[in-house]
Amino acid sequence: HDHAKMQLFLARRGGRPVGRISAHYDELALEQPPEQGMGPGTGNWGLFEAEDEAVAHALIAKAEEWLRNRGMTRVLAPISLSIWEEPGLLVKGHDHPPMVMMGHNRPEYESWVERAGYTVAKRLLTYDLPVEQGFPPLVNRIVALGEKNERIRIRPVDKSQFKRDAAIIIDIL
């Protein structure tokens, strides 16, 4: 987060925490073309939790104000600090366990955020595939093509070189 600016907010009622939110923007993302999703003037809020709709709206308004005061003219949210962390709201599948790098929130957040003026920017999907069933044929075909391509190397992570391999994975993502 060397190139990001952020402010954290905590809502209290009677001295007791009842919600939280982050307001943030990535200076590198501001330089991207808007067609790539961010672009000039785009800020975000995330790390969102609220006890009720009134708290939710107060926190969202505070995050929007902070972003506006720093020149942001558009808000893409919720995104927890980076698009590479937890983007979006879970709107279906609350009966399933959380997925890696995907938000998992209370069902009512969808309507609270919509009533705060937000609409869907992009639908994100996760899939639950029991490993004992193996991969679908399409995935197997893609892997086979990759194995035949001399420019692609498929190998397990080398635990003795974990930092190096983690950097490679992050670079790919």
Residue map of PLM features:
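Acyl-donor binding region in acyl/amide transferases
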Residues: 34-122
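A short helix-loop-beta-strand connector motif used in the catalytic cores of GNAT acetyltransferases and
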Residues: 1-13
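Glycine-rich, positively charged N-terminal anion/phosphate-binding segment
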Residues: 23-37
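Acyltransferase donor/substrate-recognition loop-hinge adjacent to the catalytic core
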Residues: 103-173
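Conserved beta-strand in the GNAT
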Residues: 10, 16-26, 44
